[in-house]
A protein has these predicted regions:
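Positively charged, low-complexity intrinsically disordered leader regions
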Residues: 1-40, 44
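Anion-binding alpha/beta catalytic cores of soluble intermediary-metabolism enzymes, centered on
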Residues: 74, 82-141
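Electropositive phosphate-/nucleotide-binding environments in soluble metabolic enzymes
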Residues: 1-8, 36, 40, 67, ...
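Active-site cofactor/substrate anionic-group-binding motifs, chiefly glycine-
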Residues: 26-80
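A generic local structural motif
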Residues: 14-17, 70-72, 124-125
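Residue-level preference for alpha-helix termini and adjacent loops
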Residues: 10, 21, 35, 39, ...
Length: 141
């Protein structure tokens, strides 16, 4: 986790060095739960790094209407996208996505965890405190 926080700090300090790091890459975003910060963060990050983000609105899609299975949707989507981020009601659905995807799936939030928020919080602590050493941190769900 510390390596991820260090990389995030480096990207934040030197954005020009990463301007093309996602060139020609496509991020597919599946958000069952509405989001402002998570969605904008991923879309902005992809744009600033030269990639593209596609938002899939489950409320108006065959998946959301129950006409297409999650497994089939992800199998198809992972043929087009390089990366998937999912913000879902059930963590078990995230597990299904990961099992049926041929590309990495990022947990953008589930009923079990919000790891991207944890990483953002750890980056903030590092920026304010200088490192992650010291008191033990814990979170309640």
């Amino acid at each position: 986790m510390a390596a991820s926080v260090e990389l995030a700090a480096h990207i934040k300090a030197h954005p020009a060095a990463y301007a093309d790091s996602m060139a020609r890459k496509v991020l597919f975003m599946v958000f069952e739960k509405p989001s402002l910060r998570t969605r904008v963060s991923f879309e902005t990050g992809m744009a600033r790094m030269g990639g593209y983000a596609i938002n899939y609105d489950t409320s108006t899609s065959p998946l959301g209407a129950g006409k297409e299975s999650l497994e089939d949707t992800i199998r198809v989507v992972s043929r087009y996208a390089d990366l998937i981020v999912a913000r879902l009601y059930k963590h078990t659905d995230l597990d299904k996505m990961a099992a049926h995807s041929s590309v990495p799936v990022i947990n953008g939030l589930t009923d079990l965890a919000h790891p991207c928020q944890i990483l953002a919080d750890l980056l903030t602590i590092t920026e304010k405190k200088g490192d992650l050493g010291g008191p033990t941190l814990s979170a309640t769900l």
